[in-house]
Amino acid sequence: MFKAVNPRQNFPQMEEDILKLWQDKGVFKKSIENRRDGKRFTLYEGPPTANGRPGIHHVLSRVFKDVIPRYKVMKGYYAPRIGGWDTHGLPVELEVEKELGFTSKNDIEKYGIAEFNARCRSSVFKYVSEWNKLTERIAYWVDLDNAYITMDNNYIESGWWALKQMWDKGLVYQGHRVTPHCPRCGTSLSSHEVAQGYKDNTEDPSVFVKFEIAKESLAKAGLAKKWAYPADKPLYLLAWTTTPWTLPANTALAVSAADQYAILDMTDYYMILAKPRLSALKLAENPVAGECLGSDLSGLFYKPLFDPREFGIPVRNMQDNSETGVSEELLYPVITTSYVSMDDGTGIVHTAPAYGELDYESGVKYGLKFVHHVDLQGRITGSYPFAGKFVKEADKDISRNLKERGLMFRNERMHHTYPFCWRCDSPLIYYAKQSWYIRTTAVRDELIKGNQQINWYPEHIKDGRFGDWLENNIDWAFSRERYWGTPVPIWRCEKCGRTECVGGIDELKAKPNFKGMQEKLDIHRPYVDEWTYDCDKCGGNMKRVTEVMDCWYDSGAMPVAQYHYPFEPESRSIAKDGRFPADYICEAVDQTRGWFYSLHAISTLIFNRPCYQNVICLGHILDERGEKMSKSRNNVIQPATVLDKYGADAVRWYFYTAAPPGNARRFSEKLVGEVTRQFLLMLWNVYSFFVTYANIDSFTPSEKYLEGEVPELDRWILSELNQLVLDVDKGLDNYDPTQAGRRIEDFVGYLSNWYVRRSRRRFWKSENDADKLSAYQALYTCLVTLSRLLAPFTPFVAEELYQNLVLSADPSALESVHLTDFPVADTALIDEQLDNEIRLVMKVSSMGRSARSKAALKVRQPLAEVRVVLASAGERTGLMRLAEQVLEELNVKALAVEEPGTVIPEKNYAASTEGAYTVAVYTGLSPELLAEGTAREIVHRLQTMRKSAGFEIADYINTHYQADEYLDSVIRMHSEYIKKETLSNQLIKGNAPEGAYAESLDIDGHSLSLWVAR
C-alpha cells in the first residue's frame, strides 16, 4: 500500500518535512561522497555579501546554480559545491558608516581606522543566518560550513600572490590619469564598477557657452584676412557641455580637422561652430560671414572663462608640471582631435584635462594647461563665488555667472545616461589623480581569445555584451582610497621612491629589518600599515602604500584564493584534479562587467587561460507590470512571502520555465500561483489519482505487467516518456534548464490530459486484468521516472514521489531520489510514428473543442460529424487508424478527412483553423442527439452529487429520481449508460428512502429531482 495522498497538499509544509528528512539522513553529504570516484564537476559560487538581506534575485541565481550540479551528480559526477562570502569593500563600509552616522572619510579617520574596520569585520555576517536559512529553504545545496571568506588572512595572501605575478610581468603600475571617482566614498572606481551604476533618463544642464577668441591670434592663424569683420565686434567659439562645474578647468577647445566650420553674424558679435550642426541647433537662418575647415582653426587662442589664478587655483603645464605665473598672459588653444562628433553639441568640444579621460590624453599630447579646482569630496575649492559647493550644486551658480557676463548662449536641461556609484548612488565625477592600475590592455588579445573558449548561455553574450566589453577594455584601476579591504601589497621607499610588490607573508618577513607585525596576524589596515623594512637599494624605510584593493579583485581571485594557492601543498593540484577551471558559473547579466570580468581578467593575467568553461547569464527580475523592482516603487517581493505561500518548488519551477535564462522575467505571487496550478497541481493530481486507485486495487508494481502485448495507449506514453528522458538529458547537458523544464511540462500535460483521462475506465473497472495492470504499471513508470527527471528542478516534489512510490514498494532502494542515477532512455520503446499520430489526434481534438466552443456547444452534447483538413495527405492514415479516439474526444458520431486545401462551407459548421489544419463540427442537432446530450448532463450532475454526498470513488449507489415527461423518457432510454457511468446499482423512479442525499435540478428548462443512497 502506498501512503494516501492529500489532493489538497500543503506544499510548503511538505517541503519542511522533506528538509528534515534530508537533514536527518545527511542526503546532501551522501550525494557528494557517493560519487567520489566520478569525474569532478566544479561550480564556482559568486560570493554574496551577508551584511544585507537576501532578495528574490538571489533566489533566482541560486536555483540556477543548483539545477546543473544536481543533474551532474545524478549523472555520476563528483560535485562538491563550496560557498563563499564577499566581506570587503564599499558595500560593507557604507553600511557601517550609516550605522555610525558618518558622512565622509574624515569621520572615519577621526573615529579610527582600527575601530572602523573592527566594526566592518563584525558586520559582514549580520544577516548570515537569513542567508543560510534561505539557502536551505530553496534547496540550494552548497557547502556553507567550509565557505571561503575574502577577509581571511589566507585568502588575502593568495590575492597578494596573484598581484605579484602581474607585477613581475610588468603589468602593474601607478599612473596619474583621469579615473571615475565617487566623491561620497572618496575613492576611484573601476570601469566594471562604473558600468553597473549607469542610470538612464538622468536630468542635467545642457549649456552652450561662448569663448572669446584673442584677436591677435587670428593673424597668427592666417585667418585675419579671410575673415574680415568690424574690429569692434567680438568673435566667439561656441562649445557645449552637460557639466558646467568643469568650465573653470577648461584649458582648450577641440575641433574636427576635416569638418567645415561656419562663422555666423549674430549682429552684435560673430560666432563659430560646426556647419553640420547649424540645422540641429536652429541656427541655419543666421547669416554666414565665412567658412573654413576645422584644421584652419588650429592655432587660434581664446580667453579663459575664468582665470583660476585670480581665485587662488594654480595653473600648471602638463608638459613639465611647472606653474604659470600670475603675471603671465593666460590664453588657451584650439586643438584638433579625432573624438569631436557632429552628432551632438556644436562640433567644438570643451576640454578640461583634470575632469575627462579624453581631455587628459589631449592635455598630455598638446602640453595643455592643467587646472584642478575640485577636491576629492567633489567640492569647489579656491575663492570662486561658488566655492565650497558640491559640483552638481555649483552648476547653477556657474551658469548664472556666465549669463551675467554675456557668455551663456543657451541654458537648457536634458535627459541622458549618467554614471552613479554602484554602492552609495552618488553621481560620479571623472577626476585626474594618482591610482594603481593593472595593465589589462596588454592582454586584450588573450582575453578575447580566451572568451572564445567559454560557452555562454545565451550565446549572444559571448561576442555581444561580454565580447564588446573585452574589445573596449581599459586598464583596471584596482586601488581604492578606503579602509576595509585587501591591502595593496606594494611598499615604497620613503627615501628613494623605489616600489616593490610583495607576494606573501613569508616573503615579507624575510625582508631586511622587517618589523611591525603583531603577534596575532591580521592583514588589514591599520596593522599592515605599520609593517616596514629596509630598502635594498638605499637602505631607506619601505612603507606600504595606503590603498586597498577593489573588492571585485577579491572575488575575481577566488579560483586560487579559496584554496590558499599556492601556499598549501594540496592547492597546487587544482588544475590536475578538476578544481580549476570551473565547469560552471552562473550570475545575473550585469556581472559581465563585474565578477565574470574580474574572474576572466585575473585568470588570463596569471595563467593565460579562462577559469570557467560554461556560464549561464541571467536576466533581471521585474515586477508583474514589467517594471524594475525597487523600494521606492514599493514593488519588491520578499522571498519568504512567496515561499511560505506556494513553496520553493513552485518558485524554482517558475524561474526555470517562465523565460529563457538570459531574458528578463516578470515575477509576482500571482505568476507563481499560476505555475502551481498549471504544473505542480496537475502533476500532483495524477500522482493522487494513481495512489488512490492503486491502493483500492492493492496494486504492486512489477515490470512483468509491461511484457508481451502492451496496449497502444501504454506504448504511446512510454514512448513519449523515453523521448522525454532524451530531451531533458540533452537540455541539461546543454545548460538549458528552460527547454528541459518545458518539455517536462508538455509531458505532464500529455500524461494528465490525455493518458490518464483516456485510461480512467481501465482503472475503474472491477477486474484486475492484464489491461488494467498494464495501465497501472505504465503510469507508475511515468511517475517514478518523473521523480528522477524532476529531482534537479523541483527537489521536494521529486522526493515526495520517490519516497512514496519507490521506497514503499522496495525498502532496499536508495534512501533518496537525490542519490539515484539520472534516468536513461530505452530507445527501443520510442515509436516516433505512434507519437506523431497521437499528437495529431490531440491537435485535432483540441481544435475541435475550440470549434465547439465557438458554436457554444457543450462538450457533453453529441454531434453528428467532424470534418478535418490536414496539412498533408500522408497524415490521413494515422488519423483514420485512431479515428475512434477523435470521435470520443469530440463526442461526435462520424469523422471525415478531407483533401489538403479543402474549404469547408460555413453553413451549419463551426470551424477552427491553425495554419494548414482545419477542424469543423456540424452544428445541426437531431432529437436523438439532444436526448443523448441530456443523458450525459444527468450523469455529470449525478457525479457531482456523489462527491457532495461524501461517497468514495469506488462506492456503488442506488439512484432515485422524479422527472418531467421529457427527462423521464431520456432516463429510460439511456438507463444502462447512466447506471454504468455513476456506479448505480439501480435507477428507480420515485422518492428515495429516508436519509438519502437529494437535489432538485433544472436541466435546460426541465425539472429533475435526484436522490442518492447506498
UniProtKB/Swiss-Prot annotation:
Location relative to the cell: Cytoplasm
Pfam families: Anticodon_1, DUF5915, tRNA-synt_1
Keywords: Aminoacyl-tRNA synthetase, ATP-binding, Cytoplasm, Ligase, Metal-binding, Nucleotide-binding, Protein biosynthesis, Zinc
Cofactor(s) listed: Zn(2+)
Motif ('KMSKS' region): 628-632
Enzyme Commission number(s): 6.1.1.5
Predominant localisation class: cytoplasm
GO terms of biological process kind: isoleucyl-tRNA aminoacylation
Highest taxon of the lineage: Bacteria
Gene Ontology molecular functions: aminoacyl-tRNA deacylase activity; ATP binding; isoleucine-tRNA ligase activity; tRNA binding; zinc ion binding
Signal sequence interval, chain numbering: none
Catalytic activity line of the entry: tRNA(Ile) + L-isoleucine + ATP = L-isoleucyl-tRNA(Ile) + AMP + diphosphate
Quaternary structure note: Monomer.
The protein's role, per its UniProt record: Catalyzes the attachment of isoleucine to tRNA(Ile). As IleRS can inadvertently accommodate and process structurally similar amino acids such as valine, to avoid such errors it has two additional distinct tRNA(Ile)-dependent editing activities. One activity is designated as 'pretransfer' editing and involves the hydrolysis of activated Val-AMP. The other activity is designated 'posttransfer' editing and involves deacylation of mischarged Val-tRNA(Ile).
Entry's free-text remark on domains: IleRS has two distinct active sites: one for aminoacylation and one for editing. The misactivated valine is translocated from the active site to the editing site, which sterically excludes the correctly activated isoleucine. The single editing site contains two valyl binding pockets, one specific for each substrate (Val-AMP or Val-tRNA(Ile)).
Protein name: Isoleucine--tRNA ligase
The organism of origin for this protein: Dehalococcoides mccartyi (strain ATCC BAA-2266 / KCTC 15142 / 195)
